[in-house]
């Protein structure tokens, strides 16, 4: 995929998901990529993943994480000097499963996240890839961020509520 992007003149990508591909992806054999790298002429900004306290990796996604998880992980990324925090998002995520009305739980989560980022502009810079200057690629990768198991439990309860009433 990265080679095809490079041949097409696309120099940035964010499709690498360590919670799915991990160390066997072929991007950096034997390493779980969590920080931007250069591979096949493309600067890969991997989706942010974290250990959810159960030993499993989970990707940062508006519908897959609670607001509390996202806020906490953003602060941890800042504290540990991570160069990027990439959140997976799909255009349909603000809709319910039937895709016929807004999913109020996710809409509220999105608004809270936007408000948090707006209040903390001095700490977090939100930007697209357009005009981004690639950093020197890391050949060593830090361990994924970690979220406590109680946040995972809170997310599971929130997701159960969302599926039942969302």
List PLM regions with ranges.
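C-terminal domain-boundary segment and adjacent tail
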Residues: 12, 64-166
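Active-site-adjacent pocket scaffolds in enzyme catalytic domains
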Residues: 1-80
